[in-house]
A protein has these predicted regions:
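N-terminal, positively charged regions that mediate nucleic acid binding
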Residues: 28-31
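Short, structured interface segments
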Residues: 52, 101, 105-120
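Bateman/CBS regulatory modules and CBS-like beta-alpha motifs in cytosolic regions of diverse proteins
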Residues: 1-26, 37-39, 43-48, 57-88, ...
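A broadly conserved amphipathic alpha-helix scaffold signal in soluble, globular proteins
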Residues: 85-88, 115-118, 146-149
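Short acidic/polar active-site loop segments enriched in Thr and Asp
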Residues: 33, 93, 154
């Protein structure tokens, strides 16, 4: 789960001697918003497509645009979630990875981050989703786990989020069974507010609904 484990080796890097035109060409070819600028393995910063497009002279070299570079980067030995934070903060489709000496290791793409997040969240595991709402003091992971296990289920992934304006605490559970109606009923019996659930019952209902819509369309 470290950033160095998810570096994309195919991402190009720019030099200070590269022109605006060449940089834009690479950005378009690789469909990214930024590219790293490197000098003798040292990371100098990210240059954005927006800043490049603002230049009237495509023959201008990147040496003259250093004041626009995003100099932030993430370290190679930290958790990948820091890369997600970087991407959101800078609205960048590339996250540069460096060591303590700012030596450039490579970049993580947002498309790769999405796949990593999917694995991290258990998105590829078959199961059901239950979303609970509660006051923060009501949250007890031990009690939630007990109710899940009492219904012969296991938690694949658990995520929490707080609405800072209301103080409401949201808990999203991904469990290993699709038939979750008994588990939902168990939460409701224990006075949990079940905001949303998605299991085999809803999946089958959606299939039936889509089939009926298709039949109506074919009858037109």
């Amino acid at each position: 789960m470290l950033t160095i484990d998810h570096i994309n080796k195919n991402t190009p890097q720019l030099q200070l001697t590269d022109t605006v035109g060449k940089s834009l060409h690479l950005i378009n070819d690789y469909r990214v918003t930024h590219l790293p600028v490197v000098l003798e393995k040292k990371f100098l910063g990210l240059v954005s497509e927006e800043d490049l497009l603002d230049q009237e002279d495509e023959q201008l070299t990147l040496d003259g645009l250093q004041k626009y570079f995003i100099q932030d980067a993430i370290l190679n030995d930290i958790h990948f979630l820091n890369a997600v934070e970087f991407s959101l903060k800078h609205d960048s489709s590339l996250v540069p990875v460096v060591n303590q000496q700012r030596e450039y290791f490579g970049a993580i793409t947002t498309s790769d981050l999405l796949k990593i997040m999917g694995n991290f969240a258990g998105a590829y595991e078959i199961g059901g989703i239950i979303v609970l709402q509660m006051e923060r003091p009501q949250f007890s992971i031990s009690e939630i786990s007990r109710l899940v296990e009492n219904n012969d289920c296991h938690i694949l992934h658990l995520n929490t989020q707080t609405d800072h304006s209301t103080g409401i605490f949201t808990v999203t559970l991904h469990v290993n069974h699709r038939e979750i109606a008994p588990l939902v009923a168990s939460f409701e019996r224990h006075e949990y507010d079940v905001l949303y659930s998605y299991g085999s019952e809803k999946f089958e209902n959606e299939i039936d609904s889509n089939y009926n819509h298709l039949m109506k369309y074919l009858d037109i």
